Amino acid sequence: MPENISHDSETPAQEQQVITACAFIHHNFDGIEKVFLPKRADTKKFLPGVYELPGGHIDYGEDIIKGLKREIMEEFGMKATIGDPFATFTYLNKIKGSHSIEVIYFAKFDDSLENIVIHPEDHSRFEWIAENELGKAYTEYKRGDDPEMQAVKKGFSLLKGELLAFN
């Protein structure tokens, strides 16, 4: 990577489409389903200090599931089982100059939750957040109407077996 670029999310991709895979990693804590939401480091140029679903860019020619597993291992030192995709959305990344297509999958950690590692250049911390606590994850950059937060709400609805509306 060029010297002035510290992370792939800053690598220029002017007018290119980028595939991003993310995981709705959930766990049941004493009967309460929660989602794993790491908080991006404040030093990030794109969405600093924002809670997000774990994942990242899929490399050229890489299988999307293998790429998502790779991202989870790189960022948190954890193996994960990836389930079905349940949400997609697109956004423009003004830092990279790219058009991102995000695909969100259900997932579970395979390793003990005590083994989660946080790399400070990527994330400052993480939370396990229940559906009724999602307001804790909102920031000036990411509110309840944000597409990723809408996908998190959808994930909780699907876990509860609720039927979804169609557009």
Question: Where would I find each of the regions flagged by the language model?
Answer:
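A structural signal for short, well-ordered beta-strand segments
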Residues: 21-23, 85, 103-107
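Conserved Nudix-box catalytic region and its N-terminal flanking loop in Nudix hydrolases
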Residues: 32-74
